[in-house]
Amino acid sequence: MGPVDPEFFDGEEMRAALAARDIGTLYRRLRRVGRSQRQLAQWTGQSQSEVSEILKDRKVHSVWVLERIADGLGIPRARMGLSYG
């Protein structure tokens, strides 16, 4: 289990954001429930400045980064269309 309650990812908005790989929406929702940019960076192996840019709607295209985000936050990779291989 990751640092975020798995039920957080079950809502309709989160399912849609994850399916679209919309990390900006994911991070904004996590910020609204009290997670800091520093925490997000630590959990996902990113710098705080990278998290900040994503919060400003910079898109994440790298599969490797998407996998780190999914794994770091405890999101099942399949929810983001990623494999476990």
Regions from the PLM with identified roles:
Residues 37, 48, 66:
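Helix-turn-helix DNA-binding elements, focusing on the entry/boundary residues of the two helices
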Residues 37-42, 51:
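Short alpha-helical "recognition helix" segments of helix-turn-helix
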Residues 45-61:
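Recognition helix of helix-turn-helix/homeodomain-like DNA-binding domains
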